[in-house]
Amino acid sequence: FIAELYGYLPELVEYFLTMFSPAETLEFIDYSDKPRPMVVRTNTLKTRRKDLALALMKRGVSLDPLASWSKVGLKIMESPVPIGATPEYLSGHYMLQSAASMCPVLALAPEPKERVLDMSAAPGGKTSYIAQLMKNTGVVFANDLKPDRQKATVANMHRLGVKNVIACSHDGRKMPKLFEHYKFDRVLLDAPCSGLGVISRDPSCKVQRTIVDVMKTAHLQKELLLAAIDMLNHKSKTGGVMVYSTCSVSVAENEEVVNYALSKRDIKIIDTGLDFGE
């Protein structure tokens, strides 16, 4: 009945019911139908959030600070102008970026002058945030399997005034061999996934994603995660920190992937010290 009411494949609803109670499943599916507010991230390489907010408000934009955990996010309530085409946007004063996609970068907590790898980077939202937190120092390798997608990454870096990023296109699984003598202080793997956590952004997932897709993706994620761990410099003062994130809610693509890595590599889970996701 839920599948029919909300337009989902029955097998997907059944899958959600293996993870959540019926009430939670209904709440999740209902919430997934609701549009998210537009969010922008202030580019502190070029401006301050206060100044950006004032500039946008002068253009008639209604906005609020994003949340207590973000010093750079702004939530756009209403706008008479296209947010992706204002003079401030074109000048690189902000990036369109969802609140959820800022969280992995905060968990990664990159420091100035470090070596950082963003393993699945395009179109560069997280990469540019990493560069911003590093104050344009050190080096960030922005990798993506598809060279065509990197055009957007490079364009965004130029617009935002980011100068410490190197864009490359490799199969992440092969990177440990390619970078045999070059290791990283921190690695972010925002892995390719089924997208079951962002159905509001892509409603086609309701009918196009199957359990087979979830399992195939989970297999790829396990390979990528091991490769990401192998890219870490264990002699780094950080000890080598990596963040694994997805935009899926499935246990197969999250907890099970992490448990697999814990069984295959000498690593431990560390507390981010952040209160979201509790």
What residue spans do the PLM features occupy?
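S-adenosylmethionine
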Residues: 1-278
